[in-house]
Amino acid sequence: AAIGAGGKGNDITHDWASAERVIALCDVHPDGTHGVTDSRKTYPNANFYVDFREMLDNEKDLDAVTISTPDHTHAVIASNAMNRGLHVYVQKPLTHNIEEARVLTKIAAKNKVVTQMGNQGGSSTGVVKIQEWVDKKLIGKIHKIYAWTNRPVWPQGFDMESNEEEKPANLNWDLWLGPAASTKYTSQLHPFNWRGWWDYGTGALGDMGCHILDAPYKTLGLHYPTDVECSVGQVFQQAWSQNYVPKGCPASSIVTLNFDKTSKNDSKIELIWMDGGLRPSHPEFIPADDFLGEENSTNGVLMIGETGVISCGVYGLGPKLYRKGQETIEFSTDDYWKTLDHTHHMEWINGIKAGYGSDEYKKITAPFEYAGPFTETVLMGNLAIRSYMSMGKDKPKFSPNRYHTSEYSKFVGRKKLLWDGENMKITNFDEANKFVGRSRRSGWNI
């Protein structure tokens, strides 16, 4: 069954349905314009539900569900499904916050269900090739990683307009809100722009981090970071009046994560993430005319070693190996890209058929035992961003004479945050720990 039948849910259902039977569809907006109607027409024999809980109660023959809903509802839906013994495929990021990722990882292991996160790049031949280069130590010890994206491609960094809007007649807005606080309907959230608001989305980092950071995280065997810090871009809609929108994600950000050495790389690593159109400069060994990462340098990764650089685009595609005094090695993933989604979905389906812990299960590239800690690491960046933007109840008022006064220093979370990953705790700034999890409406616990 597909929970979330529009948008990405519509796309992936078409893919895995070529191998399996779709017996149910679920979406809070039955006649939504972003693919829900298409899904219902394509699978006319599938029972349709608005409430996922009703679907899980009624459909006794279900084996597995895909979850393609806004980030803030991933955990509550997935936990309900797994606790019923259902296998689950969840879009990236796995969850809305760090605590939820830890909980889902434990539930999956307890119930021995087959899981996969929808970061399809993990199944690319590009990641396999990068792993080969890392294992052979072709650029020596890797000490720095740059990763970046052109996201957001939705409005972000501004206040939400307070216009009164009429809710679409068939949209169940209360179900769409899920664990988030009750609020009036706005088209500024549904069906797409929810990504830029912390109650529902995870910003540019949450949207693309699991796609872009998968290659270095996996190939270098990274785990929890030791610390994190960030800076964010400023937006001024009026002179000397900086936007302060703590409920919304910033227009751009830079996040720095540090990791200890691993069994795959005998060096500490500094990982620098950039979004909002920011990207690194050309490092040594990469010719000035070469794109960084993918074409036009819009998204990418640079892994900086002692004697060279590994570059790739989103999903680990198109990796290149640059070494001093040697010809650049390029590995083409053009053909594989055409089947990337299908390969990722079929890993999950084959794992279900073979069973939890089977050889086929071990071929799954993003089961929750991997995707959970990985998502925690990605969302550490968002914890730092939210801490950076946190300053208490007072909204700052800037003027030419007060821009650098003590009022500006109220942003008390602008520091390096030290992280105890095993215990999910910031050890040097307790206020930031409120962003490890979230508050939930009654009836929406996981």
Task: Pin down the residues of each PLM region.
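Structural recognition of the beta-strand scaffold that forms the well-ordered cores
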Residues: 1-3, 23-27, 48, 66-68, ...
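N-terminal glycine-/serine-/threonine-rich beta1-alpha1-beta2 phosphate-ribose binding loop
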Residues: 1-90, 102-114, 357
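Extracytoplasmic/secreted proteins, especially bacterial periplasmic and envelope-associated proteins
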Residues: 7, 11, 34, 38, ...
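Short, solvent-exposed turn/loop segments enriched in Gly/Ser/Thr/Pro and often Arg
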Residues: 29, 49, 68-73, 94-96, ...
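Short aromatic-enriched loop/helix-cap "lid" or pocket-rim segments at secondary-structure transitions
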Residues: 37, 129, 155-161, 241-242, ...
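A contiguous active-site-proximal alpha/beta segment in oxidoreductase catalytic domains
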Residues: 87-89, 95-170, 175
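Glycine-rich, aromatic-lined ligand/substrate-binding cores of catalytic
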Residues: 164-165, 169-367, 372-396, 403-446
